């Protein structure tokens, strides 16, 4: 099998996990391609002698499977690079939460064995696409988790006029607005009171950030509907954050958000169940009185 490896470049203390991964793949005779930036970090900064049959930049690669070793942020970066290639992504968690990257370092060896035995499942995760005339946002307009519209450099709220399929929904007076996929519903959206949505739902969550109203609540819509946003701000600009990567926009920029025409394939072990992950990672339903 041919693997493309992505990893973060700051977790020096957890370098042994990366070394273990490469040894496991080499043991199976895998063809290993490594993101050049990650390879440089391993070789130059950590002095690890890892096998790499090829190095690649940006999205200039092909593979049977992508492995992301790091946290959920590393997984999101890998997903951005994979784009519409249709390559499944396996996430190994060396970060904190690990909701997307949910294979622990202790499970690595067993998981790689399962990959070679074709004993795993692949989940299709929907992606959001942002359409606008801002050239900076056009470089990477896709989000696996969320697209967030936020105020910038001001204590004043922004006004976000929101339409669904051309029909006016409301004008949010708030610090921002989060448009999230089911995958992203357990990320930024959850932290501001958004709903938890099971990954396979064909829906999009719209959640305001600190709205100046008691009558505004999150809303869930069909994922084949189109969202149009017009923003007004006293500073005449605002932030757009796509899976955490942000750019400044002028308030004259109209934003259109819809489901992308491709999905991200996420590799899951058979016994990794979404509701189990909710309980163990998010402490869902935990009661200290019991």
UniProtKB/Swiss-Prot annotation:
GO terms for biological process: NAD metabolic process; NADP biosynthetic process. It catalyses: NAD(+) + ATP = ADP + NADP(+) + H(+). The gene is nadK. GO terms for molecular function: ATP binding; metal ion binding; NAD binding; NAD+ kinase activity. Belongs to the NAD kinase family. It is found in: Cytoplasm. NCBIfam families: PRK01911.1. NAD(+) binds at residues 72-73, 77, 145-146, 175, 186-191, 210. This is NAD kinase. The active site is at residue 72. Involved in the regulation of the intracellular balance of NAD and NADP, and is a key enzyme in the biosynthesis of NADP. Catalyzes specifically the phosphorylation on 2'-hydroxyl of the adenosine moiety of NAD to yield NADP.
């Amino acid at each position: 099998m041919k693997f493309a490896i992505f990893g973060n470049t700051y977790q020096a203390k957890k370098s042994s996990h990366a070394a273990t991964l490469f040894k496991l793949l080499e043991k199976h005779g895998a063809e290993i391609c490594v993101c050049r930036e990650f390879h440089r970090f391993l070789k130059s900064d950590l002095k690890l002698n890892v096998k790499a049959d090829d190095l690649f930049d940006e999205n200039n690669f092909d593979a049977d499977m992508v492995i992301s070793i790091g946290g959920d942020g590393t997984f999101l970066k890998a997903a951005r690079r994979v784009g519409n290639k249709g390559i499944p992504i396996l996430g190994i968690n060396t970060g904190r939460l690990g909701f997307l990257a949910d294979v622990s370092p202790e499970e690595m060896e067993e998981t790689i064995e399962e990959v070679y035995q074709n004993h795993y499942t692949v989940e299709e995760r929907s992606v959001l696409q942002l359409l606008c005339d801002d050239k900076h946002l056009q470089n990477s307009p896709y989000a696996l988790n969320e697209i967030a519209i936020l105020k910038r450099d001001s204590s004043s709220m922004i006004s976000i006029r929101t339409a669904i399929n051309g029909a006016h929904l409301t004008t949010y007076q708030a610090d921002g607005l989060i448009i999230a996929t089911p995958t992203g519903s357990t990320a930024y959206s959850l932290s501001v009171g958004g709903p938890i949505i099971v990954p396979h739902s064909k829906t999009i969550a719209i959640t305001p950030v600190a709205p100046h109203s008691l009558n505004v609540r999150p809303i869930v819509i069909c994922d084949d509907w189109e969202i149009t946003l017009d923003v007004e701000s006293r500073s005449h600009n605002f932030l757009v954050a796509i899976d955490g990567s942000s750019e400044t926009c002028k308030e004259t920029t109209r934003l259109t958000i819809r489901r992308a025409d491709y999905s991200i394939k996420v590799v899951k072990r058979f016994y990794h169940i979404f509701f189990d992950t909710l309980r163990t990672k998010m402490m869902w339903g935990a009661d200290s009185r019991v």
